[in-house]
Amino acid sequence: MKMVEIKCPSCGGKLKVEDSQTKLITCEYCGSQFLLDDEKVQHITNYNIYQTTPSGKDQGNGAKIALGAGLACAGVLLAAFILSSGSGSSSGPRTAPPSIPAYTRPAGYLGKEGEAGEEVREEETAPKADSPLFHAMTWEMFQKEPSEISPEDLAGVRYLKVETSLETDRVWYSFDDPYSEKEPVVQTASFGAMDWEPQDAAAFTGLVKLDLGSGLSRVRTLKGLKELKGITAGNVEISGIKDMLDDPAQITELQLKGITSMEGIASFENLERLTVRDYPDTNLKQLVPLKSLNYLSLEDTVDSDSIISTDKDKIRVKDYSAISVMCGLKSLYLNSDIIKDIGFIKGLPALEDLTLEDTAVISLASLSEVPALRSLTLLGNNKVQDFGPVGTAPGLTSLSIDKMTSQPDPDLSSLSGLERLEIKGFMSISSIRGLSSLKELSIHNCNVDQADALSSLTGVERLTFYSVWNSQGNLRNLDFLKGMTGLKYADFTGNLDGTGWSGYNYLVEVYGDVSSIFNHQGLEELYLDNGKFEINFDKIKENPSLRVLGLRNMELHKNYYVESYGGMTSVWYDDVKLGEHMDILSRFPNLEELYLDSNELADLNFAAGLKNLKRLGLKDNYITDLSPLKQAEFLEYLDIRDNPVGEVGDVGNGVEILQ
């Protein structure tokens, strides 16, 4: 007698017999119910398992995870007791298994990622791709009927990502290699409720990177995808992914979540990039043999301080010391409130990029002992006692700090090679004065009493600036930008989702005139969306360099009078409507993109002079007549949602219109 462990074909859980008379069995983990059906062939007894429709559930849902008799006969995912006569063979015809309904989502249901529903076949060859979503996406890709699509067409798709939800299926695809040095062009498509068999993805035989999320759990084989290098999956064990492939050594990137074991990871001997959400072990020793690993991302989603967490008993990494011997690591991302010390990064010879998010790290002293470090990101980490060591990493070219503590700001003045800087929660920006190598600068949630320090940053080309304050209240002007002679991009839009540090205003509010920014020579993109300030329109001069302008939802004022006393500030002003000053747009003759949402505009007469306009956003206004746009011969995109527009007319020819 040979005994084989009984497992649920849906989730792999343990099955138990509920009723020996009706032969009803139930999965102890997911609750799925099955019936045993005997097939007697000489001395062999096979048990075919069919899932019954749970009481009160839609019949379609019951069929979703039905498995055919071929599954049981293969003896791969099922449980069985096999009684043999010793010959190891059988004779006589076998009873054909009953047909199992194909997986069909009920009307209006698009399927949940990770549901079992794929009938497993004995043969290695994947079934012919034939699901409605497959046909929809291939039409989007090739504009051909199914019969006209060749294997060569399908092989041309190099990247594929599919997400399904209750209302929408979304597909991302590219004909470019995502691992090449050239940035791939990724296209997207959205569809309504459609059936989708993730196994159909194997029809794209030239895939280099595949992201099916939890849908990969319904894929039996990826054999034949010889060029596949990257896989993103959820709720699929590593050993299962290994068995899908011709050779796991071909894979260089894995992005995983919802796994319970690292078993099989050693088979991916050429793995270069690994991302794991909720690593299923207490240490990282299994990763040490992966000598090609150069990127590691580990996210622990458990909140140790939560009093309502249901994950208190979850297996978590408590020992990160194995990282100290991963000498090939170039990039490391860690998110875990278990991490209190980062001594394991000391001396990593190749580490160039380090991100620490929401850790419990107390000291950053180890940063000075990472010789190759070029990029550092610190997000959260509210237990840090001293940010000073950040300034002792002279090789840094990129730095992002979200300082969520009252500890002193680090002195950044010695980081002479810094090219990109993002700071949040700083009490002073004086230490950035003189950072002549800076090209990108983002300042949020900071005290800007020393805003004049920005005038010394002549090399900065991109500036993002919002949610700031000073000891006198709000800013009075933006004149400190005049010294930033290299500025090409300025974004004062703000953080509209309301997330950020402390309770400060998330937008830019200036108690005075900001017209000087419109005259900034060399400025190509300017975003002042949702701003509250004055614009002295008479001071705005012609600026031929400006190509993109965002003026969404403007709250304009004039005649500011500000009075402060005893820590209280009172402000008086008069309101101004942007629509009364649209003639200023003629001073930007090379404008290509203009966004004017939510400004109570009633006409488009201003557009007649914008000959180079390609994109125009007018959402939520009072526009009724689009005829002035006929003169915008290069117009490609028009957003007129939430406007009482009647006929689009000739404007619609060749223009993408959101209406």
Q: Where are each of the predicted segments found?
A:
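Residues immediately within or flanking Cys/His clusters that coordinate Zn2+
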Residues: 3-5, 24
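Short cysteine-rich clusters marking metal-coordination/redox-active sites
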Residues: 8-11, 27-30
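Short linker/helix segments within small regulatory modules
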Residues: 17-26
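Short Cys/His-rich micro-motifs in 6-15 aa windows
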Residues: 31-41
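Alpha-helical transmembrane anchor segments and their immediate juxtamembrane flanks
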Residues: 58-97
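Surface-exposed cap/linker segments adjacent to membranes
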Residues: 117-148
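Concave beta-strand-loop units of leucine-rich repeat
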Residues: 159-198, 206-218, 227-240, 250-261, ...
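Hydrophobic anchor residues at the C-terminal helix/turn of individual leucine-rich repeat
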Residues: 201, 219-225, 244-245, 265-266, ...
